């Protein structure tokens, strides 16, 4: 990602499955799943007395068959916890695609991890994701995202954690997440201003497919790039909702073709199928077509 301008990641992040690192069987199953990314969780889903066992599970898993065409993210415990240092040593040893920091409250939380990765000569490809799941995290979302433009920060993505946010604020679960929308949109505005991606929070009732569909559609309409998932049954719907449909792809290709026509040279606004289209729409169209190509390549590589 270019740090001097808000250029977004080119990775697919429609479906981001969280898997407890303590569950060795679930780890193995991720290889065959169609999710775009996997979060290997060492934090909330692992009891304190089993943290060391979970780290050993991840060591064994990473030494085996690689996860092809999936981002691998390790969610660590807070660095100021008794587990944080051991988790970071594991991250440095395994070199996943990203480390996910829990309860990020301020820019310094990101920069301290960035400095630690730099001091350890971790590869630049090892990125940072931030859980935004506290009142301070929401209030400081823009400042945290801006830290992503600091040279060497490695910040790529925000993940919203509504379970913790509800607990800390007292906000009750509600269809449509009416009272949470301002907070969610604050996250979207922050990442868009500074070229990051945003992943929506988990939906806890994985058996309620209709409600999950509705929440995915809601998140996509707000501008989220994907959804954090707790069960493989949610992958297909997330991929569908956060991926472009055929009509959108066709429209984007028409916009690209229209601006490529020599007659459009030097024009900032043109007519495409009866609509006035600006060059800013060309950028959006190119991004959408690129995303569609990445999805097609994933399907071919299966």
Task: Specify the residue positions occupied by each region the protein language model found.
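Expand to "…catalyze enediolate/carbanion chemistry for C-C bond making/breaking, isomerization
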Residues: 1-302
